[in-house]
């Protein structure tokens, strides 16, 4: 789960790739050019023919040491009194039945750890309060994170630019809530119980989030592929131009180039990352992806283990045990990014409880065999006639897709690397954002070496 951050003029898309004033339907395009809160400074040529099978050489040792496994999280962690009071009032005012007469001393709330963007809480009725009707007894309270603090990252900009930032931030949240409601109505996501400027109340689904290691389990990987293919097949009433990816990276990069840290350690970390000549790298990446075929579909854009629920009671089901959640980055985008981004997430564990609160291991990137397993499950769901193709046609399709997603994995590293630098400045979530940015750019250059680009 990662926090949105947007800048730019009125003609640019929000981080969701959406414009309230934009309409029209754009056909899928052949290429880019042809169409994870307590420390503010805690901080090829176009594919006309078939390509040879993409060989992924053995990766080098991981750039970061692997700390010991995390200790169990604290139980029933409580929010600060002001947050508790606001949560109580939201639940009392938005939820029906027994919630309406609930006293504050009867209100139960606990912190849900693990979000890198938003603050999450479980709110519930006590066992002593009987239900009146079919009202939920537990709900999830989501409070928006650093997107509400965008001004602080652009203090030197014009008042007009700051106002545009604030408008686009508010627009993004409204549109994400609209998207959330649509997916809920289609039974593709949790129900929406209430929405307000600071966040929303969602259905609390008995479940747990996947662990990073579970992404590589064959049955889990196959179902994620099927869920993603279904997501990609949806028709949504949003801007269908694939502007989100490079529009967002350009905005992040502009912010990063203007950032100033007061802590010397952060200054040195930023200096090291800027020595990579990020503007030139971004243009090289754009040139590479311009000649990489990838259909434009409705993408999740953040399909990591923390955004995939394992449903309680469905653990032994073959194909109905998972649910995708957290759609704040969803937009029409290149398919290769969504899948490549998911593959990148195999390398990162965000559950480590000591600084920098994540572990990275490049060796965990899926092997060619694991990628083909995912791609086969994806194509069987996404492409109705895939299984009727000849074995030669299936092979060629999968080889093209291997090249597609591994190239777009570069964009994943670049995007979240920039994102993390911005978060180091504006986020109040306790996380080693600068260390994470460094890890993503190290992985970016490693992926370039593997691909020979």
Curated annotation (Swiss-Prot):
Its EC number is 2.7.1.32, 2.7.1.82. Disruption phenotype: Death at an early embryonic stage. Embryos die after 3 to 5 days of development. Keywords: Acetylation, ATP-binding, Cytoplasm, Kinase, Lipid biosynthesis, Lipid droplet, Lipid metabolism, Nucleotide-binding, Phospholipid biosynthesis, Phospholipid metabolism, Phosphoprotein, Transferase. The keyword Kinase applies. ATP binds at residues 113-119, 142, 203-209, 304, 326. One of its GO terms (molecular function) is protein tyrosine kinase activity. The keyword Transmembrane does not apply. Its main location: cytoplasm. It holds the Pfam family Choline_kinase. GO terms for cellular component: cytosol; lipid droplet. Residues 22-81 are annotated as: Disordered. It is an enzyme of class 2 (transferase). Plays a key role in phospholipid biosynthesis by catalyzing the phosphorylation of free choline to phosphocholine, the first step in phosphatidylcholine biosynthesis. Also phosphorylates ethanolamine, thereby contributing to phosphatidylethanolamine biosynthesis. Has higher activity with choline. Belongs to the choline/ethanolamine kinase family. Homodimer. Heterodimer with CHKB. This is Choline kinase alpha. It comes from Mus musculus (Mouse).
């Amino acid at each position: 789960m990662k926090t949105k951050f947007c800048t730019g003029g009125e003609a640019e898309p929000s981080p969701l790739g959406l414009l309230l004033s934009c309409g029209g339907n754009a056909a899928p395009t052949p290429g880019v050019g042809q169409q994870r809160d307590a420390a503010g400074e805690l901080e090829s040529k176009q594919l006309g023919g078939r390509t040879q099978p993409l060989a992924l050489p053995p990766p080098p040792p991981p750039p970061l040491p692997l700390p010991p496994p995390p200790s169990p999280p604290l139980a029933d962690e409580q929010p600060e009194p002001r947050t508790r009071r606001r949560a109580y009032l939201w639940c009392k005012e938005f939820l029906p039945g027994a919630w309406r007469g609930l006293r504050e001393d009867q209100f139960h709330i606990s912190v849900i750890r693990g979000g890198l963007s938003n603050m999450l809480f479980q709110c519930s009725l006590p066992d002593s309060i009987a239900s009146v009707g079919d009202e939920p007894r537990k709900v999830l309270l989501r409070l928006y994170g650093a997107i509400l603090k965008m001004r602080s990252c652009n203090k030197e900009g014009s008042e007009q630019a700051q106002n545009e930032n604030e408008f686009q931030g508010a627009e993004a949240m409204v549109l994400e809530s609209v998207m959330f409601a649509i997916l809920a109505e289609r039974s593709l996501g949790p129900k929406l119980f209430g929405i307000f400027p600071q966040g929303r109340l969602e259905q609390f689904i008995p479940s747990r989030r996947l662990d990073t290691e579970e992404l590589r389990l064959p049955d889990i990987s196959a179902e994620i592929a099927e869920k993603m293919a279904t997501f990609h097949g949806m028709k949504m009433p949003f801007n269908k131009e694939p502007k989100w990816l490079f529009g967002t990276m350009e905005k992040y990069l502009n912010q990063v180039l203007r950032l100033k840290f007061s802590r010397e350690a952060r200054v040195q970390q930023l200096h090291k990352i800027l020595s990579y000549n990020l503007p030139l790298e971004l243009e090289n990446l754009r040139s590479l992806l311009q000649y990489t075929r990838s259909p434009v579909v409705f993408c999740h854009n953040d399909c990591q283990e923390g955004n995939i629920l394992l449903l309680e009671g469905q653990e032994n089901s073959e194909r109905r045990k998972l649910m995708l959640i957290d759609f704040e980055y969803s937009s029409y985008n290149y398919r290769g990014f969504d899948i490549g981004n998911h593959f990148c997430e195999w390398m990162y564990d965000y559950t480590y409880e000591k600084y920098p609160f994540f572990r990275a291991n490049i060796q965990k990137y899926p092997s060619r065999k694991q990628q083909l397993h995912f791609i086969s499950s994806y194509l069987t769901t996404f492409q109705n006639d895939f299984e009727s193709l000849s074995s030669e046609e299936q092979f060629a399709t999968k080889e093209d897709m291997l090249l597609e997603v591994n190239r777009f994995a570069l964009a994943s590293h670049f995007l979240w690397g920039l994102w993390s630098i911005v978060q180091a400045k504006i986020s109040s979530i306790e996380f080693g954002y600068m260390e994470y940015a460094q890890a993503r750019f190290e992985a970016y250059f490693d992926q370039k070496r593997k691909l020979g680009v």
